[in-house]
Every structure is written in C-alpha cells, then in structure tokens.
Amino acid sequence: MTTPTPAPAPTTSASQVPLSPTTGESMNVIARRGRVGLWFIIVMSVSGTIALIISYSYLWSLNVNGGWAPPGAKLTANQTNNTIGKLRGDFAPEWPFWAIMGVVIVATAFMWWGYRSVRTKGNHGALVAGSTLALIFSIAALVAQWIQISTFPFGPTNGAYASAVLLLCASNIFNLLIVIFVLIGIVNRSRKGLINKLVWYQAQATSYWMTWVVIAFLMGVIVTTFMVESPNTDPSIFGGFKQQ
C-alpha cells in the first residue's frame, strides 16, 4: 500500500503582492478600490470646473447691462441707462496664469517620474526625490496663486469678469490644497518604504490626480487668455431692482 504524497507547502515569492496588514486582502484589491474612489473625486472636480468654465463663457458672451468687466461695456446712444454704473479697473494680466500652470506642470512631471521609477525599476530613492520636489513646486504654485489673487486690479464686485476669474482661482487653490495634502502623505510613506515596486497604487493615484489638476488649470488659462473682452459690444439692458 502506497502512502499518499503530501502536497507541497506554498512558497512565498519575492514578487508576490503583499497582503494588507489591516484587512488581510491583496494589495491589488485595495488598489482597485482606491482607483474607483479617485475617479469619483475626479468626476466631481470635473463637474465643478466645467460649471465654472460654462458660467465664465456665458457671462462673457452676453455682457448683460455692460457688466462683464472693467472698465464697462461700450453702450450705444440709444442704450443709455443711468442705472448702469461705469466700472473702473483693468483686466488681469495673462502671463501669471501661464506661469502658475507651468509650475504645476513641473510638479506633476516630478511626481510621474518618481512613480514610474519605483514601479518599473523599484527605484525607491527616485520616488522620494520626485514626490518631495513635486511637493515643493506645488507649495510654490499655491503661494503664487494667492499672490495673484491679492494683486488683481479689481475686487469681486467689479463686474462679472472679476467674479468669474476669482472663482476660477479659488478652484485652483482648492485643487492645490488637495495636491499638497496628498503629497505630504506620499513623501512620508515613500520615506518609510511603504510605497515600493509591489505597492505603488498610491503614487499612481496621486499622479492621475495631479494630471487632472493640470487640465483644470489649462482650461482656466485658455478662457482667461482668449476670452477677455466681451464680443457683445451692444449688450441688452435690463431694469435694476430698486428698494421701495
């Protein structure tokens, strides 16, 4: 009578995906959930950004009551309306929008370099360096965005253009704050070796999010560069509300 041969014990390969220390699930499963959550956040941000772009374009094209932007609309003689105040001020300079976007692009490039290095080559040092540089440039972009807002030649009540531009810049600040918050976590986790060649989904998600932030900046830069003076120089005039 032959004795059954026992099954060989499972071996642990160096390339085996580790399990989560909290749930015991494969890190691939955790990564898949993380990607789904990331796309939900991106869809939410896309919806808000597109709404701002549409609002900007709508107000720019209508120029109702000549209230699009400083120094006010050029009204014809038969459209004189004393209830319309002539706004004073200037449009925002265009180059700071492009400069700030350039800084964000550099930060995103560093993050992608670090992520690709650790995923394909297992270069842990490149991820630490890339995420740290991305964090520094993101903070620089946030400071530059704040300086731009504080030096605008108009306030939020100086026409529809002023309000629309300020909202776009506020959206940029919100996106940059998320980027900085996430990058702080990436830097800390990469320094501790928690992000490596086997577990890289957090660096990937951060790279995806930063790519979307660049696209959001680009959409804002396009409208603030090529849609400045309203094409409607003969705007409609509507009555104003008066307190009885």
Describe the function of each predicted region.
Residues 2-244:
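...captures the hydrophobic TM-helix bundle architecture rather than a specific catalytic motif
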